[in-house]
Swiss-Prot record:
<dbReference type="GO" id="GO:0006412">
    <property type="term" value="P:translation"/>
</dbReference>
<comment type="subunit">
    <text>Part of the 50S ribosomal subunit. Contacts protein L32.</text>
</comment>
<dbReference type="GO" id="GO:0003735">
    <property type="term" value="F:structural constituent of ribosome"/>
</dbReference>
<dbReference type="InterPro" id="IPR047859">
    <property type="entry name" value="Ribosomal_bL17_CS"/>
</dbReference>
<dbReference type="InterPro" id="IPR000456">
    <property type="entry name" value="Ribosomal_bL17"/>
</dbReference>
<comment type="similarity">
    <text>Belongs to the bacterial ribosomal protein bL17 family.</text>
</comment>
<keyword id="KW-0689">Ribosomal protein</keyword>
<dbReference type="Pfam" id="PF01196">
    <property type="entry name" value="Ribosomal_L17"/>
</dbReference>
<protein>
    <recommendedName>
        <fullName>Large ribosomal subunit protein bL17</fullName>
    </recommendedName>
</protein>
<keyword id="KW-0687">Ribonucleoprotein</keyword>
<dbReference type="GO" id="GO:0022625">
    <property type="term" value="C:cytosolic large ribosomal subunit"/>
</dbReference>
<dbReference type="InterPro" id="IPR036373">
    <property type="entry name" value="Ribosomal_bL17_sf"/>
</dbReference>
Length: 133
């Protein structure tokens, strides 16, 4: 018997859940940090971590598997060109979940999901300011 294996249902149909996790995964890979509820963040981590592990070996088969799950060519390119090489030496644990308190409307626990070892936004702003001078 299965006994509760797989992802949480999150009070959604299977199609809605798949689409939501796919959209959240694309957003996380694009922006490298997103704010969401804590249960969604924990499920997102279970989906994103294997994708980054897949990107560490850039074969055609792995790119096709990534496209099958992401359905976004730009994110597949970013995954294999930037994120795969960035985490080449890390054996796992590519995401970090930080608790951010509770949402005002319904008191839902909120969390920030971010990729570890991501470039600092403040450093990019300083580099842009230095280049402008």
């Amino acid at each position: 018997m299965r006994h509760g294996h797989g992802l949480r249902k999150l009070n959604r149909t299977s199609e809605h859940r798949l689409a939501m996790l796919r959209n959240m995964m694309n957003s996380l890979l694009q922006h490298e940090a997103i704010k969401t509820t804590l249960p969604k963040a924990k499920e997102l981590r279970r989906v994103v971590e294997p994708m980054i592990t897949l990107a560490k070996t850039p074969t055609l088969a792995n790119k096709r598997l990534a496209f099958d799950r992401l359905r976004d060519r730009d994110m597949v390119v970013k995954l294999f060109a930037e994120l795969g090489p960035r985490y080449q030496t890390r054996p796992g644990g590519y995401t970090r979940i930080l608790k951010m308190g509770f949402r005002v409307g319904d008191n839902a626990p909120m969390a920030l999901v971010e990729l570890v070892d991501r470039p600092d936004v403040s450093e990019e702003i300083k580099d842009d300011a230095a280049a402008a001078k």
